[in-house]
């Protein structure tokens, strides 16, 4: 190492490096976002801001607002104007550049008609040349749901069920029950459904086994909304209504229906009661959304599940006897399962449950013969269009079961099954075999393949 009087080369290099590291970049600046989250209710406008320090104009800089990917901006502002056509899908037509404070280094993005999907983190990136800095901005979106509704189901064998329902919440809320003295009560079940609009519906069930319980309250709340929504019910009063002593009767057996046919779900009040003034709801697993609603003598379409829109109708010829039939047209495989039929009035409901079994009988099996490389022979049996998953069976001419070499089931876009099964033929003396494909309800299709002369 070469040394100069009073200096060392390593010391000079270290000093030079220190100067480089501490030298102020000609474009040096930083970006600062708000210290606290920005709060906005669904449907309102939100204003996201960030500041350039030290203060200077951003008119000739690039300002990029984005969520997680800088290449997919919410908005891009460059050289004094918005760059069109680059906004993320879902923000197009809803974002606006605010120019009021560009001279002071403050920039703002307005999001109009805030939606639940707007909730979360945003980044504000400011760039000049190749130099950029960014800061994060947190937007917290909230929606206050509808006032809770408590209705009574039963009484049943385990007691009276109280169901607390509400819609239109964001983010996902919490639910709790209290007795008349403020004591917490344990829910039997709690279901939160995320709707097409991005909002949550709540269905919380409480079982009351103590006849002395009089008043019960349901509370629903979420973050950012300090006061919970509340509903209270006086139980003895509800249990004295006429409907509380009635019951709903539905089919005792599952209803079989083929794909494309019409499903008919019939429910009736017992004893017979005129149901014209009642609310009648057909549900799947939860209270919201519904398969079909009849209330105040009319059909309510607003609560209906998307997959049932335009496919349901109601037969009301015997409504004065408390009997109604829901028709679901053009049955699909997704319609299979359990349905709940509820009659209600003044917050008291009685229900029956109905099972639907959807089936589709597939095509006639096709059997083809294939010669293997080792000289052996296999038979391939194929068919499609089955639901639910069918049973496949090979048999010889005497009806004895033959073990298949392999079976494969595939579901297409309509959830119908395609079937393929292979049979290795080891005995050339067999005259013929059959391939049978059947459903649990007894529907069956069979194909026969002759093997004589091999």
Curated annotation (Swiss-Prot):
The chain crosses the membrane at residues 7-23. GO terms for biological process: negative regulation of T cell receptor signaling pathway; positive regulation of interleukin-2 production; positive regulation of T cell proliferation; regulation of cytokine production; T cell receptor signaling pathway. It is found in: Membrane. SUPFAM superfamilies: Immunoglobulin. It is a single-pass type II membrane protein. PROSITE patterns: IG_LIKE. InterPro entries: BTN3A2-like_Ig-C (IPR053896), Ig-like_dom (IPR007110), Ig-like_dom_sf (IPR036179), Ig-like_fold (IPR013783), Ig_sub (IPR003599), Ig_sub2 (IPR003598), Ig_V-set (IPR013106), IgSF_BTN/MOG (IPR050504). GO terms for molecular function: signaling receptor binding. It holds the Pfam family V-set. Residues 1-6 are cytoplasmic. Glycans are attached at residues 210, 427, 432. Keywords: Disulfide bond, Glycoprotein, Immunoglobulin domain, Membrane, Repeat, Signal-anchor, Transmembrane, Transmembrane helix. Residues 27-140, 148-234, 236-355, 365-452 form the Ig-like V-type domain. Disulfide bonds join 50-124, 164-218, 267-341, 381-435. GO terms for cellular component: external side of plasma membrane. Negative regulator of T-cell proliferation. Belongs to the immunoglobulin superfamily. BTN/MOG family. This is Butyrophilin-like protein 2. It comes from Rattus norvegicus (Rat). The gene is Btnl2.
